[in-house]
Every structure is written in structure tokens, then in C-alpha cells.
């Protein structure tokens, strides 16, 4: 889990647009972020496996 101070800091609007860093909206993780879902890979996998994300299904071939 991310520090509360880092999550609050990332929610503020940066002085320059280039300073913006995406964070997972669920856990606050800054790395392995999927823009389409606004989640990190760990939360995406967790919520997709229990069917919380519409349109995402487990792949099989």
C-alpha cells in the first residue's frame, strides 16, 4: 500500500503537466498502471477474476 501522504500528493494538480504521475485508484500503487481501467496490474487481476470489471473475461485458447 502507498503512503497516505503520497496518495494525497498525487491527487493535487501539479504545477506543470509533466509532473503528473498515474496511481491506482484502489490501492495507490504508482507502477504497472493500466490507463483504461485506472488500476494497477494487481488490482486489475483481482477484480477481473471475481467479475467486478464489465467486459473483461479470462482468456482461453
Swiss-Prot record:
Pfam families: Ribosomal_S14
GO cellular component, one term: small ribosomal subunit
One record GO biological process: translation
One Gene Ontology molecular-function label: zinc ion binding
PROSITE patterns the UniProt entry points to: RIBOSOMAL_S14 (PS00527)
Cofactor(s) in the UniProt record: Zn(2+)
Family annotation (InterPro entries): Ribosomal_uS14, Ribosomal_uS14_bact, Ribosomal_uS14_CS, Ribosomal_uS14_sf
Residues the record lists as binding Zn(2+): 24, 27, 40, 43
Domain of life: Bacteria
Transmembrane segments: none
Keyword field: Metal-binding, Ribonucleoprotein, Ribosomal protein, RNA-binding, rRNA-binding, Zinc
Cofactor binding, note field: Binds 1 zinc ion per subunit.
Similarity comment: Belongs to the universal ribosomal protein uS14 family. Zinc-binding uS14 subfamily.
PANTHER family named among the record's database cross-references: 30S RIBOSOMAL PROTEIN S14, SMALL RIBOSOMAL SUBUNIT PROTEIN US14M
Summary of the function given for this chain in its UniProt record: Binds 16S rRNA, required for the assembly of 30S particles and may also be responsible for determining the conformation of the 16S rRNA at the A site.
Complexes and interactors: Part of the 30S ribosomal subunit. Contacts proteins S3 and S10.
Protein name: Small ribosomal subunit protein uS14
Originating species: Pelobacter propionicus (strain DSM 2379 / NBRC 103807 / OttBd1)
Gene that produces this protein: rpsZ
Amino acid at each position: 500500500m502507498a503512503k497516505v501522504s503520497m496518495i494525497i500528493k498525487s491527487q493535487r494538480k501539479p504545477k506543470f503537466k509533466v509532473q503528473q504521475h498515474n496511481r491506482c485508484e484502489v490501492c495507490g500503487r504508482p507502477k504497472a498502471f493500466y490507463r483504461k481501467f485506472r488500476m494497477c496490474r494487481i488490482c486489475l487481476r483481482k477484480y477481473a477474476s471475481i467479475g467486478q470489471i464489465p467486459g473483461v473475461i479470462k482468456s482461453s485458447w
